[in-house]
Amino acid sequence: MISQSASVDPEKFSGVWALSGTYGAFTPLMYTPARVWSQQNQDSKFRTGVLHILAGHSGPETAADGRTHFGIFATQVWKLFPRGQVIHINLWDYNDVAPGYFAAAEIAARDPKVGVIIIEVARPDFPVADRNTFADKDLTAARKGLYVIRDFTPGKPKHGTVICQGSSSTVNVVKVISRLEEAGINVKIISAISEDLFDRQPQDYRNSVLPPEALVDAMFVSSATRRVPPVRDLGPLTDEYSLTSDWDNQWLTSGLEKEVIEEAHLDPESIFKSIKRFADDRAKRLERQKSLLAKLVD
């Protein structure tokens, strides 16, 4: 259906876009037809429509329905496309949904290369985030892909960058910000909605949010897995300090949402301890990386 157009001009599309979706854990069933569609879109001489995949009820939270419903590893299949041919957005706050999606849709409408949009959302009924407390107070910040929740406090030693992705993971990082500040921990906290959107931002903005040097001084807190971090090119020690749903390389069990999040180590206490360890070890982390580089020039 999305391959059909009523336009006689091959450069213009006059047809419909389509959407299909299910639990994030089951969306791999849709991967093969979506991949074939992406290949067709790439090679078509005519403008075509855009396929939407809704990976709903994604993340560890859905284990409340049973182990079969975990949307942790499964949604990683949506990274298996040539870069630039899909836009994947992972949303955690209600106010991120509209700007994040419409930014992706605007790009897809203008760029014939983009044939698929993947929308990943979780189920929990979290309170709407108070953006007056964020460093980036823009209500449409999600359109930029990555945005700053907390910036470094000027005049104090910096302890690194924390990149968040997913619902419970980001909500619980926000919950411990005041506690981190009371403990003297000065980290920059970034919400990662979509690396695909972030890649399309001006270089000045990208450098202001996540400069290249920050990649080797970062950890991430994600409701996904350690195999697929929120952004690429992170440093060699990032995995050692990051928190993900597969932190112990085991399939998780199931239970109440609170129990599931605690087992995944994405509860506020686990997040606070991990960020504190990351901050406390900063000098040691940087020294270890310096020693690795030094071995290359000996």
Task: Please annotate each region the language model reported.
Residues 27-28, 37:
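Intrinsic-disorder/low-complexity recognition with aromatic hotspots
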Residues 30-32, 65-66:
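Long mid-to-C-terminal assembly/interaction modules of large eukaryotic proteins
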Residues 55-75, 83-88, 96-100, 105-298:
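Thiamine diphosphate
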